[in-house]
Amino acid sequence: MRAVVQRVDGASVSVAGATDDPSAPGVVGEIVGEGLCVLVGVTHDDTPQKAAQLARKLWSVRVLEGEKSCSDVNAPLLVISQFTLYGDARKGRRPTWNAAAPGEVAEPLVDEVVAQLRALGARVETGRFGADMRVSLTNHGPFTVIIEV
């Protein structure tokens, strides 16, 4: 599993069709104040154990102001699935997605990351798996780190 973790002062994700107007994007997840926006990618050999390991790492990694973790200050996380984290653009002009797990494999593992975070006591908001999403955030720093488990 691969996660791109950004320290934010607020973030939201919206999806077209999430409101009564199918063409208007509606907010499906939002965090206010200091927290983490986490983009999660899944590859073929990922397991529920790796999802739990990633959740523990996200909850305890000290990347917030003052070298604090989300668990230290009860900061929220916005978790968004993103298969493109396993894209490969080394050859040609078009990336390949061969390393990304198919949706039927990836979705339950992203859900497991979220469930494990919540079991640890985290406040978690999410995007919508497989949807065309719009992510808005205020990056604090900017501070971005990649975590692989």
Swiss-Prot record:
The keyword RNA-binding applies. InterPro entries: Daa-tRNA_deacyls_DTD, DTD-like_sf. GO terms for molecular function: D-tyrosyl-tRNA(Tyr) deacylase activity; Gly-tRNA(Ala) deacylase activity; Ser(Gly)-tRNA(Ala) hydrolase activity; tRNA binding. Disulfide bonds: none annotated. A Gly-cisPro motif from one monomer fits into the active site of the other monomer to allow specific chiral rejection of L-amino acids. Homodimer. This is D-aminoacyl-tRNA deacylase. It comes from Streptomyces griseus subsp. griseus (strain JCM 4626 / CBS 651.72 / NBRC 13350 / KCC S-0626 / ISP 5235). The gene is dtd.
